[in-house]
């Protein structure tokens, strides 16, 4: 039989809480997500159908909605931490937490550190969409806002709208390397991160 003389904080335990400082931290990672593609879709429909739409107006509206999404998510996390012990107590033995049994507290109350991760999903879709609109409408003039909205309204059905879809899909995309899509992804990422950090 092996003997282990390690202090509780110097080893890790198995399970889904792989980011945890063993026995000391309450982690909630890979769970909380903000879908930036959905935010883009909402903002596109608010801006593109109005008079004189532009990528800048779309970006301004996107930032406003992104700020709201991050704020609402932060409020939800705070609510979760405040009420988790009442509705879904964490399994004390599984997490090997310190002071939960000794103090009669839930892990969300006894944890020395709280580590919450907020993921931004849908980045490629949002970045590619911004890039396609900027490149094909504003830089090259191959399409108009009216053509794009008409094609979307008809789910790109019919030869004319399929052409619009192909033009948009062949624009500079995310992960092509130094592309317009990459630049938009970086821009969205920076703004997303800035807002999440501000809510901490």
Q: Language-model segments: which ranges?
A:
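Conserved catalytic cores of very large enzyme subunits
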Residues: 1-200
């Amino acid at each position: 039989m092996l003997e282990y003389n390690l202090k509780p904080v110097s080893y890790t335990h198995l399970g889904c809480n792989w980011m945890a400082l063993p026995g000391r931290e309450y982690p909630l990672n890979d769970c909380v997500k903000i879908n930036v593609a959905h935010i883009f879709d909402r903002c596109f429909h608010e801006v593109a159908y109005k008079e004189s739409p532009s990528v800048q107006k779309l970006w301004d509206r996107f930032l406003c909605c992104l700020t709201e999404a991050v704020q609402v998510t932060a409020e939800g996390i705070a609510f979760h931490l405040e009420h988790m012990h009442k509705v879904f107590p964490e399994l004390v033995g599984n997490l090997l937490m310190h002071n939960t049994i000794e103090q009669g507290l839930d892990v969300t109350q006894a944890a020395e550190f709280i580590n919450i991760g907020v993921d931004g999903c849908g980045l490629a879709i949002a970045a590619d969409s911004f890039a396609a609109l900027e490149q094909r409408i504003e830089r090259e003039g191959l399409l108009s806002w009216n053509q794009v909205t008409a094609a979307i309204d008809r789910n790109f059905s019919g030869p004319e709208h399929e052409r619009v879809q192909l033009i948009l899909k062949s624009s500079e995309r995310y992960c092509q390397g130094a592309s317009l899509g990459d630049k938009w992804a970086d821009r969205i990422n920076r703004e997303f991160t800035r807002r999440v950090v501000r809510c901490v």
